[in-house]
């Protein structure tokens, strides 16, 4: 008689769109096992946090000078996909990421097309610098 093996857990694909498993992709940033190496990786991890309702990560990676005080999960939004259009680094501490995020609210489909600005600086004195989201400009109309 052979012993039964427990069923294998199905890997969860990462919502960020890179095609990797969540635990090996954005999950490592969310758990604190790694730090996003560039603004694009941070932006993808923030999108994934929105998909998963991880508002702690969204707040932690938002520059304190622009982070809203009333940041709450939006349970009415269903995120459908992310497409990164461009990533440009101006210098060691400034970068921009242009992306399109698709989502649905109340059965209606929308597209968020944004050019986001990021800075790389320590969160606190004596800590190593990390990428932080500052703000973004909408490109075209939301549709």
Swiss-Prot record:
Taxonomy, superkingdom: Bacteria
Lineage: Bacteria, Pseudomonadati, Pseudomonadota, Betaproteobacteria, Burkholderiales
Protein family: Belongs to the UPF0225 family.
Provenance organism: Cupriavidus pinatubonensis (strain JMP 134 / LMG 1197) (Cupriavidus necator (strain JMP 134))
Name used for this protein in its record: UPF0225 protein Reut_A0143
């Amino acid at each position: 008689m052979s012993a039964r093996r427990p069923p294998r857990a199905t890997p969860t694909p990462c919502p960020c769109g890179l095609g990797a498993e969540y635990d090996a992709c954005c999950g490592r940033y969310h758990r604190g096992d790694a730090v996003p190496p560039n603004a694009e990786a941070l932006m993808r991890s923030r999108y994934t946090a929105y998909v998963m309702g991880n508002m702690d990560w969204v707040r932690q990676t938002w520059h304190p000078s622009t982070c809203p005080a009333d940041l709450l999960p939006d349970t009415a939004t269903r995120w459908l996909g992310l497409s990164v259009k461009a990533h440009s680094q101006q210098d060691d501490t400034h970068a921009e990421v242009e992306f399109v995020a698709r989502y649905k609210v109340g059965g209606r489909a929308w597209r968020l097309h944004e050019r986001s600005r990021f800075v790389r600086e320590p969160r606190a004195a004596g800590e190593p610098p990390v990428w932080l989201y500052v703000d973004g400009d909408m490109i075209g109309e939301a549709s």
